[in-house]
Amino acid sequence: MAGTPNYNRREFLATLGAGAAAAVVFDQSAARENAGLQSIRKRIEARTFPSVFQAWNPADNLKDEDKLTTIARHDLLFHGVGFFGLKWDHKHAGLATKFRKDSIRRGLAKRKELLDKNPNLILIAEIRYRDASRKWFPQDYKWWKRGKDGKTMLGWAEGGHLQMDFSQDAYRKHVAAQAGAAVASGVVDGVMLDWWRDDDDRLALMKLIRAAVGPDALILANANDRTTPRTAKFINGYFMECYRSATPFQWRKIAETLAWVEKNLRKPRINCLETWYHKSRKDLHLMRAATTLSLTHSDGYCLFSDPNTLSSGDHLHNWYAFWNKSLGRPKAAGRRNRDGSARREFDNGTVVYNPMGNKPLTVTFDAARTSLSSGKTGRTHTINPCDGDILLLKPSGSAR
């Protein structure tokens, strides 16, 4: 869409009505409340590794731990606006352009609680643009997407959501205003867009959203294992919801996409790699493979979770001891080999990734290392295919 304009924030506000424009102007009390917090970039750069994210639903295996403490084990969280305490100021949430003031106060209090527990945590609000519950708009509203028969269209086969028509320019501007309101609240650091791909309508929408949230807010988009070159410069990170990880080809595609986004998306980057278990949460080799792939190919975040086919709720997961902070910061970029394996040096040890389809990989060090996967200490360690390991200079402590 060559004719799609590139808006800046001032120009975007000028396209909106007065009420919607006011909603995306920063609330002064919110700005004062957050003045002492580290900047987004500093929080991203200050965190240590491994670095895990939460996609909507939590880690649910730490039954005796306070829920906010478990959330704060993660370094990035995205969720619906309601999770953060925000409530749209309209009977139909999809028609709102601002939040109730009391909900902004609740949201700021929850943000403070979480950042007190993890000062490097990044908070992202999902903005719905493609599908939503049937209550999002009035039943016959013009922004529902309809098929040739005039009937509304399901969001996806097994879900109860309906699709919205983001081919309409007025609707795209409205979505952008909602994104701007979320960031303007001061409760979150940016917005997340699901079901992302490159097409003319999404490009037009993305330009409006970037103008609405400003240059410093974060935009996360779920492109799965695909790349989106047309919208890349507006996006800080992909939520790589990788539902295909059964073959060597699929793992190669994941690795190639992760390497691409680390070079081509907007800085600061917040790429989030998720794979799902095949048989159970005890597929520890798959968890380690996803974690070490993320560590060797990116400065991003990882997650290993339940598959969406379960009825219990998408993206539920365990918190694994392998994810406890042990590595410190990376000392250099990862080094990738022709066979697809990779290695990266950190302050406190070395990460090795061995992809599906490879032979077992043996690594030897000048001095003894402790394997985080086995607990064994020695100079030589073997990593099986579709697995990875963290090899520490000294045994790991009890850091979360």
Predicted feature residues:
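Bacterial Sec-dependent signal peptides at the C-terminal "C-region" and cleavage site
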Residues: 23-35
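Generic detector of low-complexity/intrinsically disordered segments
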Residues: 15-18, 28, 374, 393
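Glycan-processing catalytic domains of CAZymes
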Residues: 34-397
